[in-house]
Amino acid sequence: MKLNRRHFLKTAGLSAAGILTSQLPLSSAEAVPKKPAAGPSVMGLVVPKMDTVRVGFIGVGQRGSGHVKHFCHLDGVEIKAICDTDPQVLDESIQFVTTQGLPKPAQYTGSEQAYKDLLNRDDIDIVIISTPWEWHAPMAINTMESGKHAFVEVPLALTVDECWQIVDTAERTQKNCMMMENVNYGRDELMVLNMVRQGLFGELLHGEAAYIHELRWQMKEIDSKTGSWRTYWHTKRNGNLYPTHGLGPVSQYMNINRGDRFDYLTSMSSPALGRGLYAKREFPADHERNQLDYINGDINTSLIKTVKGRTIMVQHDTTTPRPYSRHNLIQGTNGVFAGFPNRIAIEQAGSDSYHKWDMDMAKWYAKYDHPLWLQMGQEAERNGGHGGMDFLMLWRMVYCLRNSEPLDQDVYDGTAWSVVNILSQESVNNRSNSVNFPDFTRGAWKTGKPLGIIGT
């Protein structure tokens, strides 16, 4: 979705839809709701079976266009409408659909409010939202209020108040609102989930998650693409801007919101140096990139304590020159798995082999590959999308809707994982003092069923 600097400055703190609040996060005490739930809990929500899932897309830029392509290769779906403020990317997605021999979708453009016309249609069941971050919450809320299920790119929300608005709307409308955390559908993450459920690591103690991905080059995207708006978040906040890719899988390993929940967080950031240095090196002195005050620390490290006493380290770094990593570490009383590169150490009777990493993963894949990957992995890899995880996520969403099954990720997961952005900023700004997590489940986490090892 083409949105430039002018748009960012106008909408980052206020929503054109009138429901976004200030970027400044509420304190955790203020975030506790003083009103009853808006409706029944949507944990484990099951909606009527859909023989055909009718889809609308809002935002088909770099991310959303990939979703359109994947949906063209899914059975049991119809692409009804596509919306984007950029006519060029809109036309490209429309043309891709028709070149696959599928009916031409309706198209909506012309203003930032054009998506509401798409939502007014009565022939759409779900809406895929892939827009700049500040639009995620209002569009998700508007989608559910229009009687449709919302599937939203990460992060789900940018303030505590937005998180509560989304939860309240999901409960009031009894609609799904899933933040599409694709990494949970990676082969390695699914395998580790299977290992955890089979008790390989014993009782879980600690996890480590991260989004370490050098993205300074996006600063050269001035008028369009992700860098044209994402760069400015480094001038607005100092915390973990993007926590969910690493945190989502670790949360599912630990049954967060399904028997345990995040209790409190403490966070600290390194100096913010890298983006300013990059701007000086890559742009003229009078360029707009050299007029910005980059305040987000190059590396942010947060520690989360769960109600059961377990710990999770979460890191964010999209600035320093280093290899990509999400850490993906889970430690239990009987052993540990760590990713990037994959390695494992398990205590075995009469052996101290756990003192050395086992990096030969072939035998572990053979024994613990997730049933879903065994059944769908080849098709997922063939269709692509971050090694197949994107396709598998979308396939699984459609499968659940067509078979009247609960989604693997619900609105409580999306808000709990996303709120780390806000709480980390609050902690950093308060000398790393701890900040309490809101309980978006309103106590339902105590009886939530753990995510099982599922197949097709």
From Swiss-Prot:
Keyword set includes Transmembrane helix: no
A GO MF term: hydrolase activity, acting on glycosyl bonds
Cofactor note text: Binds 1 NAD(+) per subunit. The NAD(+) cannot dissociate.
Cofactor: NAD(+)
Modification comment: Predicted to be exported by the Tat system. The position of the signal peptide cleavage has not been experimentally proven.
EC code: 3.2.1.-
Chain sites annotated for binding NAD(+): 62-63, 84, 133-136, 153-154, 182, 242
Leader peptide range in chain numbering: 1-31
Keywords for the protein's UniProt record, in alphabetical order: Glycosidase, Hydrolase, NAD, Signal
PROSITE patterns from the UniProt entry: TAT (PS51318)
Alphabetical list of Gene3D superfamilies matching this protein: Dihydrodipicolinate Reductase, domain 2, NAD(P)-binding Rossmann-like Domain
InterPro entries named in the record: Gfo/Idh/MocA-like_OxRdtase_N (IPR000683), Gfo/Idh/MocA_oxidrdct_glycsds (IPR050463), Glyco_hydro_109_C (IPR049303), NAD(P)-bd_dom_sf (IPR036291), TAT_signal (IPR006311)
UniProt: substrate binding residues: 211, 230, 242-245, 324
Its job: Glycosidase.
Family of this protein: Belongs to the Gfo/Idh/MocA family. Glycosyl hydrolase 109 subfamily.
UniProt-recorded name of the protein: Glycosyl hydrolase family 109 protein
Organism of derivation: Shewanella pealeana (strain ATCC 700345 / ANG-SQ1)
